[in-house]
């Protein structure tokens, strides 16, 4: 009997190269038939009897894992954020959970720089004005000589530092485990969070959603920022208190913001949506051809390793 692999990723996130690798191994592929993330019940319906799963934004709950526990060996996340997977339950059932570190780093770093530029020059406001028949020029700010504060210096944070350095920016950073090679290459200076929030002209978030980071950007921290400063979040929506951010934007406590991620996705219509000095994108940091192929192939390779009796490379279940 063929081993069955459930592909949770939507069609636009399924690289042909990923599917080809799995098909070459003779696996039966069960594809997500919807142009959206599958619900818990839809996953449960498909996971029974499966040997492996590739997860996109799917919420792989305890119920899902319990349904597949007799045959399921691995859930391979197509990306690095695994907060939608019940890792504790997976550990209890002996199921590996793997990630694809580095696969989308360049793409997210690219989008982050795009958001920084968009905020600095308020490109969306000019676009909206011209579409409405108005000739509007926004007086923006240059990046050269400005200070960028990066919170989280993993692969993505390092990629942002590389790009910001090329723009002539000074870089402050916070990370629990400082990587000194970034200091040598890009002049990154590590400091504490409060110092960074007070000193930076731009704050870019690249931290995971952990108990100690959820809600880290709140009213108190936003009040530390310069009135001319901008907040960028292309990491996890849970890091920012969106109500506090809306208030800071409306009262002029900070100059602007740009978000690619939200507390709930798709985001709810809130006061934040009514702010003019903010740019929104649709959690699109990893949505490039290169990142989709890279993450998909890495996830497929992890499945092949596990189903052939080998240890996975990037198992987050300890």
Go through the PLM ranges and name each one.
Residues 1-98, 218-220, 224:
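An N-terminal-biased, well-structured beta-alpha scaffold segment characteristic
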Residues 11, 107, 166, 172-180, ...:
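Structural/interface elements that position substrates and couple domains in central-metabolism enzymes
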Residues 51-52, 74, 202, 230, ...:
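Short, Asp-centered acidic motifs that coordinate Mg2+ and/or phosphate
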Residues 93, 101-147, 155, 162, ...:
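Phosphate-binding beta-alpha-beta segment of Rossmann-like dinucleotide-binding domains, i.e.
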Residues 93, 97, 219, 228-318:
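Rossmann-like dinucleotide-binding domain for NAD(H)/NADP(H)
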């Amino acid at each position: 009997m063929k081993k069955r692999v459930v592909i949770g990723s939507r069609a636009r996130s399924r690289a042909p190269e990923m599917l080809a690798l799995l098909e070459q191994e003779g696996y039966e592929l069960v594809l997500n038939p919807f142009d959206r993330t599958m619900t818990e019940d839809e996953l449960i319906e498909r996971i029974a009897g499966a040997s492996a799963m590739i997860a996109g934004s799917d919420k792989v709950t305890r119920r899902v894992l319990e349904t597949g526990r007799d045959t399921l060996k691995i859930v391979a996340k197509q990306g690095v954020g695994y907060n939608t997977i019940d890792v504790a339950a997976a550990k209890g059932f002996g199921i590996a959970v793997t990630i694809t570190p580095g696969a989308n780093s360049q793409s997210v770093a690219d989008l982050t720089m795009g958001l920084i530029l968009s905020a600095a020059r308020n490109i969306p406001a000019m676009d909206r004005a011209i579409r409405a028949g108005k000739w509007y020029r926004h007086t923006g700010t240059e990046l050269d000589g400005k200070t960028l504060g990066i919170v989280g210096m993993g692969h993505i944070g390092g990629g942002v530092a590389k790009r910001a350095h090329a723009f002539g920016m000074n870089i402050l950073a916070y990370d629990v485990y400082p990587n000194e090679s970034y200091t040598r290459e890009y002049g990154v200076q590590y400091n504490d969070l409060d110092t960074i929030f007070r000193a930076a002209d731009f704050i870019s978030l690249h931290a995971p959603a952990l108990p100690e980071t959820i809600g880290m950007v709140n009213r108190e921290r936003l009040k530390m920022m310069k009135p001319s400063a901008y907040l960028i979040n292309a990491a996890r929506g849970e890091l920012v208190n969106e109500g506090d951010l809306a208030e800071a934007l409306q009262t002029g406590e900070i100059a602007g913001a740009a978000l690619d991620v939200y507390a709930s996705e798709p985001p709810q219509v809130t006061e934040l949506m009514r702010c003019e000095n903010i740019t929104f994108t649709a959690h699109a940091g990893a949505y490039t051809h290169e990142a989709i192929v890279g993450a998909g192939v890495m996830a497929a390779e992890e499945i092949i390793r596990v189903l052939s009796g080998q240890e996975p490379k990037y198992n987050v279940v300890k």
